[in-house]
């Protein structure tokens, strides 16, 4: 059922490929509806982390309430929920979409449909949203709006004939976009008298208010003093404040079915208010939670260690603070012989990992060393137990392993047809299995591959961009596990295993990878006073070796002429000393060495 009030509400989000102008369009909508004065307008209002502005990406979902007056005098409340565009934050996007009834699909008029346009669009369709295509960047000379419209109709299969043609940069035709939202996005429904059901689509920690939950009320009413219960954790809290975003907080008396806003209830930790959870009243609970909740599952793991061992506690505090705001981040203490005490951290994907590392360095001024990222392998041992392996150092000996499985992703790559050969070559090199390909139009092709996650985890995206001159776009999702013949590759320096450099590789590639790493390390590790052998080993078998020659003083400099035995005595003495040093000497591994190991593909 729909109340009179709900008829004038529109909840929508904006989805797009990276850099197609989603956050800029959001800025223009905020400006056009007069939500912020020009003085308060800051480019990309909704991206409020420095890192988001710098990288030009949206990391956390944001929401803002716009009041739009039509020429007919009617006033509409538009709730815009800005979503992250990157594949790592797929779950956050899907929850933000579940809070809406419609989605604006922004497509760049110069580039047309890209891989993430499709991925996000399918997510929106999965949530039964009404999709409103908007074509952006029509002020550019290379814009081809008519072709792009045709493409949207052919590839996605939605009507795009009267799609608004806008330029978010110059503010051209923004009114058309607002009209399209009002006309096409359905108004919310839901009974205001029913038991409360509200979806948390984002939550973060504020040092004054505690955890602030961004919610979409689906049914019922929530106001200050209500006792609420989170359905997945079962915890009960009392509401301290409810309000709306303009983008800053503005407390209101109550939020009813159809509204988007925030609620604070002195919750101490984001983990207690998970994205996707359902809020209901403690006394008058809803029968079942809203569907679609799933705990965030990390896909990529990496070790993070302080460069200065004494900073361990500071690193722990920093990670805890980040975790308060980021429920997808997980970490547990681990020790490494080479690096001392640190943490094994789990991330949603590479971008997420990168962002966390950068925030640790930037917001907490920590110097950190990170080890090669790895994925979760499933190992069935000979005695039948199943273990999940996130750290290569913990891999059991080959005699105990019956079966080893690695995660596989389904990836779609959209590329100009000229580069199909290069892309296929790259995918095959990364153990990809070709599934199918389709032409989107005469110039662009979509290729679908199944590739082990381990192969794309580090530099697949960079390699793809460089082979296609930056034109290809890429999107992936995890589809399951598959058995694989994998071995653990160890690196020994001066006959000691450096545990932080161990990695899991396919058996047929172990030799090439080992040789490559040994050569790379030889270039990077500084020379010492004694000779250092660098060895790559699989099990007890050494498969590659390089030697860093010792620095030596010219002990014969003071012998002018003289007997050969005198010179020999001096050289023997030097050799003896170097031998002793090598027994007691230890090798410091510089941070660059860890990074270099990752980049051995080139």
UniProtKB/Swiss-Prot annotation:
**What superkingdom heads the lineage?**
Bacteria
Query: SMART domains under this entry?
Result: EFG_C
User: Which reaction is the catalytic activity of this chain?
Assistant: GTP + H2O = GDP + phosphate + H(+)
Identify a single GO molecular function assigned to this protein.
ribosome binding
What enzyme category does the UniProt record give?
hydrolase
Q: Which SUPFAM superfamilies does the entry link to?
A: EF-G C-terminal domain-like (SSF54980), P-loop containing nucleoside triphosphate hydrolases (SSF52540)
Membrane topology reported for the UniProt record? Peripheral membrane protein
A single GO BP annotation from the record?
A: positive regulation of translation
Residues the entry annotates as binding GTP: 19-24, 136-139
Q: Name one Pfam family in it.
A: LepA_C
Record family assignment: Belongs to the TRAFAC class translation factor GTPase superfamily. Classic translation factor GTPase family. LepA subfamily.
Q: What is this protein called?
A: Elongation factor 4
Protein source organism: Clostridium botulinum (strain Langeland / NCTC 10281 / Type F)
